[in-house]
Amino acid sequence: MSGNTLGTLFTVTTFGESHGPAIGCVIDGCPPGMGLTEADIQIELDRRKPGTSRHVTQRQEADEVEILSGVFEGVTTGTPIALLIRNTDQRSKDYGNIVETFRPGHADYTYWQKYGIRDYRGGGRSSARLTAPIVGAGAVAKKWLRERFGVEVRGYMSGLGEIDVPFVDWSYVHENPFFSPNAAVVPELEAYMDALRNDGDSIGARIDVVASGVPVGWGEPVFDRLDADIAKAMMSINAVKGVEIGAGFDSVAQRGSVHGDELTPAGFVGNHAGGVLGGISTGQDITVSIAIKPTSSIRTPRRSITKSGDEATVETFGRHDPCVGIRATPIAESMLALVLIDHALRHRAQCGDVETSTPKIAGSAT
């Protein structure tokens, strides 16, 4: 299997399966000299880990990270950083009924047809469990971006099923299991998820991510555009079926006189472009939204086929998130941070000494 590495200069290669002994990643290209401890990474992993509320999978994993290499006396050395997270609460017997059948909407059928073998236990390599190492690597990227450039990457849930979650304030995001920026909506979200769980069904979600403090100039046209790499990274997250940057699909109904963000000496007027023009960062906030499909593993009986092609009915009895979007905010933040640190290093390598006589205007004129 190839395609396990993200990035060009700052690379992350993940490994492991949902019910294997451990999962993890190897980070290559991290600059030396940055203070880094397991606690720096654990705080992000704890935001993503399972079993934190009744609305997510009840698989109990501590997700305790071990730094195996790349750090000496609490400082990055510039050599590969290996992160290990041991699996401790696998329950593979729950998947005995899908050894010979394929779950609708899951990767079972495609993995089998491509490789001729699949790890049916918890989805194996295709499981969202493999987003834990991404969050671990994202913690490293976030720390470097914050300390080197003052970049902050934050996200929140902006929609759950048919429920819109209007943004109110960042302070609410860390006070509820949904990463909702609106405290008033949380009771409605809880009631919705309770009813969904009783129905044995699942639902999707929308997550918004914002990176503030990104300097102008990051991005490598034509085929490594910053927004193209962001879209690829976001689409690499399990269950993501759509990505918007800036106004996204709303751009279709906007006139050029509205969508084009005017420039003034005081700064940009609007940010419909989402902080990227021509594949290069503008110095404005980078705004990204992702659409996450409903969880494929549900208790509701579904039609499928066996390996022999015969008709079958599938019910999934494992411990699954009724909405994977509930825990997706730290994952989306991490993916954006990983793309940004990679492009920061690429920009420094080629254009770090470039200066122009044009002043760098503010991201917003207001």
Curated annotation (Swiss-Prot):
CDD domains associated with the record: Chorismate_synthase
Top enzyme category: lyase
Keyword Lyase: yes
Extent of the signal sequence: none
Pathway this chain belongs to: Metabolic intermediate biosynthesis; chorismate biosynthesis; chorismate from D-erythrose 4-phosphate and phosphoenolpyruvate: step 7/7
Enzyme Commission number: 4.2.3.5
Keyword Transcription regulation listed: no
Amino-acid positions noted as binding NADP(+) in the UniProt annotation, renumbered to this chain: R48, R54
Catalyzed reactions: 5-O-(1-carboxyvinyl)-3-phosphoshikimate = chorismate + phosphate
GO term, biological process aspect, one: amino acid biosynthetic process
Role of this protein: This reaction introduces a second double bond into the aromatic ring system.
Protein family membership: Belongs to the chorismate synthase family.
NCBIfam families cross-referenced by the UniProt entry: aroC (TIGR00033), PRK05382.1 (NF003793)
Protein name as catalogued: Chorismate synthase
Origin organism lineage: Bacteria, Pseudomonadati, Pseudomonadota, Betaproteobacteria, Burkholderiales
